[in-house]
UniProtKB/Swiss-Prot annotation:
Keyword list, A-Z: Ribonucleoprotein, Ribosomal protein, RNA-binding, rRNA-binding, tRNA-binding
Complexes and interactors: Part of the 30S ribosomal subunit. Contacts proteins S9 and S11.
Organism of origin: Roseobacter denitrificans (strain ATCC 33942 / OCh 114)
Organism ancestry: Bacteria, Pseudomonadati, Pseudomonadota, Alphaproteobacteria, Rhodobacterales
GO cellular component terms, semicolon-separated: small ribosomal subunit
Full protein name: Small ribosomal subunit protein uS7
UniProt-listed InterPro entries: Ribosomal_uS7, Ribosomal_uS7_bac/org-type, Ribosomal_uS7_CS, Ribosomal_uS7_dom, Ribosomal_uS7_dom_sf
Role: One of the primary rRNA binding proteins, it binds directly to 16S rRNA where it nucleates assembly of the head domain of the 30S subunit. Is located at the subunit interface close to the decoding center, probably blocks exit of the E-site tRNA.
Domain of life: Bacteria
MF GO annotations: rRNA binding; structural constituent of ribosome; tRNA binding
Length: 156
């Protein structure tokens, strides 16, 4: 990490179909080897599947799923006098979103369905109903923070 100054935030353009910035960030995270058109196809088809399953606006479902995955606290390691403590820290909004996106993609990739579209649609539907691997990851993170609440005075 550079000590001189923080890296500039890059401008992300909204996606073509829904005009949503968060969806673009999601696609960029899903993209492999710079193949954005493939990532777009996967996301749009997954959202169409979600729409046919639960008859709601797909972009609303996507945002609700992300909200259900976003962690409010996490633990960070802090070394104090030879011992390493897991200190609970509140998560900044940008990091919340980034973690939720990352967890959702990882959970979708680890599912058993045949295509990535099916996996992503399934994980989105699970996340909306507050179940699934990505939501479990958030719950585990919150449990870790709760268990280490005693060390919260070591914040920095």
């Amino acid at each position: 990490m550079s000590r001189r100054h923080a890296a500039e935030k890059r401008e992300v353009l909204p996606d073509a179909k829904y005009g949503d910035l968060v969806l673009t960030k999601f696609m960029n995270n899903l993209m492999i080897d710079g193949k954005k058109s493939v990532a777009e196809t996967i996301v749009y088809n997954a959202l169409t599947r979600v729409e046919t399953k639960i008859k709601r606006a797909p972009i609303e479902v996507f945002h609700e799923a992300l909200d259900n995955i976003q962690p409010s606290v996490e633990v960070r390691s802090r070394r104090v006098g030879g011992a390493t403590y897991q200190v609970p820290v509140e998560v900044r909004p940008e990091r919340r979103q980034a973690l939720a996106i990352r967890w959702l993609i990882k959970a979708a990739r680890s599912r058993n369905e045949n295509t990535m579209e099916e996996r992503l649609a399934g994980e989105l539907l699970d996340a909306v109903q507050s179940r699934g691997t990505a939501v479990k990851k958030r719950e585990d993170t919150h449990k870790m923070a709760d268990a280490n609440k005693a060390f919260s005075h070591y914040r920095w």
